[in-house]
A protein has these predicted regions:
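Conserved PLP-enzyme active-site core in the AAT-like
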Residues: 2-192, 197
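Conserved C-terminal alpha-helix-loop-beta "cap" of PLP-dependent enzymes
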Residues: 195-249
């Protein structure tokens, strides 16, 4: 994300970015606090989104596929057309969806992914990837901007380790897709569950699935009984707890 924002900042240094859909907090806070600000809209209707884009006139649009933690997926195909019409780059974070499950680069100008999570499966290495769409109208400007940026690099040891732990990523993603979907089905029949949030329920996510794609390793749910009951449930849950996802443990 940081490198994506550096590219955009070089092209449009005086404009804020626009986050479409409520995101993981750091995805919003990084452009808001370090670069030239960020705006957030949570509208899902594409006509309303287009009106907001015209009003704000951002440097770039940023979308999570799907959003974390609500697992919503906006209509990126329509938003991509709007972005092209208005000459605004579209940036996608596919960390939760995974490019093994969904095809987002076809509709985005830049796709970034956290390699710390699903790709590594170990949660003990900090790394990320960035893909530029070669068909983007901005491709030459993106490349020129990248050449001017002092890109952070992994150490040799971290690179070797990341390659090693990622060798089974295809199999892990398949297993995580399956396990998460099974958990969703079990929770759907539980009397204490009020709402479940999962990409399977989103037509926009389904429209992006690859031939072997699934719905990823993340779901969220809301309990009956309110906040106090949710706290008691969380504190009693005997699983590893942390701010990451996609690990083998």
């Amino acid at each position: 994300l940081h490198t994506s924002l550096e590219i955009i900042y070089k092209l449009f240094p005086a404009k804020p970015t626009l986050q479409i859909g409520f995101p993981y907090v750091d995805v919003l806070k990084l452009p808001m606090n370090i670069f030239h600000g960020a705006k957030l809209i949570t509208e899902e209707n594409c006509e309303d989104i287009e009106l907001e884009i015209k009003r704000i006139n951002p440097s770039a649009l940023i979308i999570e596929l799907p959003s974390n933690p609500m697992l919503k997926c906006v209509n990126i195909k329509k938003i991509s057309k709007i972005a092209k019409k208005l000459n605004i780059p579209l940036i996608v974070d596919d960390t939760i969806g995974s490019n093994l499950n969904i095809n987002s680069i076809e509709h985005a100008d830049i796709v970034f992914t956290s390699l710390t999570k699903i790709f590594s499966g170990s949660g003990d290495i900090l790394a990320g990837s960035l893909i530029l769409n070669p068909k983007s109208k901005w491709i030459d400007q993106f490349r020129n901007a990248l050449n001017e940026i002092n890109l952070p690099t992994l150490s040799d040891g971290d690179t070797v380790y990341l390659e090693k732990v990622s060798r089974d990523v295809n199999q892990r993603v398949f297993e995580q897709n399956k396990a998460c979907l099974e958990l969703k089905k079990r929770l759907e029949t539980h009397s204490e569950i009020k709402n479940i949030f999962h990409p399977e329920n989103c037509p926009n996510f389904n429209s992006l699935l690859t031939s072997d794609g699934g719905y990823g390793c993340l779901l969220s749910f809301e309990l009956n009984g309110g906040l106090n009951k949710a706290k008691k449930f969380y504190d009693s849950l005997k699983v590893s707890k942390g701010p990451s996802l996609g690990t083998k443990f």
